[in-house]
Amino acid sequence: MISAPVMTMSASALGRSIAAGEICPVELVEAYLAAISAHPDGERIYARLTRARALDEAMAARGRAQAGLRRGLLDGVPLSWKDLFDSAGVATEGGTALLRGRVPERDAEVLQRLTRAGAICLGKTHQTEFAYSGLGLNPVTATPPCINDPEAVPGGSSSGAAASVAFGLAALAIGSDTGGSVRIPAAWNDLVGLKTTAGRLPLAGVLPLAPKFDTVGPIARSVEDCAQVLAAMENRPAPDLRGSTLSGKRFLVLEGAPFEDIRDVPARGFEQAVDRLAAAGAKISRSKLSSVEEALALSPIIYTPECYAQWRNLIETAPDLVFPPILDRFRSGRDHLAMDYVAAWQSLSDHRAHYLAQTAGFDAVILPTAPNLPPNARRLMQDHAYFTTENLLTLRNTRIGNMLGLCVLSLPTGVPSVGISLMAAPMAEDHLLRVGVAAETALATD
């Protein structure tokens, strides 16, 4: 019999308990499926369950555990998947009515990899339409709840992914991040979110938004979980996080744009977190970086044309089926000139190189994950201008990491719905995770 506290254990802790024979994967999956069915918001979190698949995979995991043939720490651990990862024979609809009834024949490559590692697919979680909003509101399918405010949105676009973990309905979630879609819902639901470097993990079988920026990443209860699942998706050993310390680590607080129009609670929560990092031995510097400001200015020229080009043909067949603010945002990309788009990419490449030169020698650049708290869902529905303003504000800080091609880790600060982000150089995830686990410990210290 699986007790309630087990449902909120980290994925890594569950894996160790399975290895020790303390938890049976079949009983664990049955407990998660029962909890999802019984939860009053279960259908707002999960678009659909893969019940038969989950039970089959759990029985196979149980057999491997009994035979001493487990494939890794996550063997037998139940995960949720955002509804833009293809799942063979099960609908993958990307949060939009325009893809209703779309059933792929093959699993996404990353789902195949985690299945080979023994992880169990519980089902597909709700998301914002086409993954094109950071708020988590989706009036077309469902808007999952926020763990800290039942009237607020949960953050997006990996909204159901974060809710599935926060409400104890999955041990870990796999989401995607194009402009903040892993980190924002992680922050607003007091979880850990990892944005991986673009190109690090394969996108085969993942519904695209802006392919040059699309990334796969986990939302989890711990940094260790993020390290374990990233390693499993790459079929390699996880980095050794033991002994990580902040002593002597150099952090740069990114001033300027990340603090414009920041709300009081995120501002205070961030500064309290910085104080804790300093108390744990981190050396804190502060600076505004021209490369960041200039890269952000290019965002509308680069993002919106790429997103609109990706989905224009489908959207324009039935635009009335798309939530108006999402439709307007897509269409804002149709009037940019090709020469401006190309020139913007050339400039962005220069800004990326300049940023890396400006931040060389720092272990991480830190900033508030989001400058605001989760907005009220009803107001967002009723006031489309408010939706647009809050969406752009919500995504501003996280988009910095995407524009500059970085890997980024968002950690809970201890203040509800306030996250702190640590940014590191491209492909430096293992270093970031080692720094992150030490920061995680410092932030959890009273």
Ranges and model annotations:
Residues 22-30, 59, 265-288, 312-317, ...:
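Acyltransferase
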Residues 1-56, 279-282, 445-446:
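An N-terminal boundary/leader segment
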Residues 74-213, 256, 367-387, 417:
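Short glycine/serine-rich loop/turn segments
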Residues 21, 32, 76, 116, ...:
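Glycine-rich, small-residue loops and helix-cap segments
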Residues 61-78, 243-251:
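Immediate post-signal peptide segment of exported/extracytoplasmic ligand-binding proteins
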Residues 38, 116, 167-259, 271-280, ...:
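Structural helix-boundary/capping segments
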Residues 32, 54, 226, 251, ...:
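Residue-level signal for inorganic ion chemistry
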Residues 74-94, 248-250, 302-353, 368, ...:
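Short helix-loop capping/hinge segments that flank enzyme active sites or metal/cofactor-binding pockets
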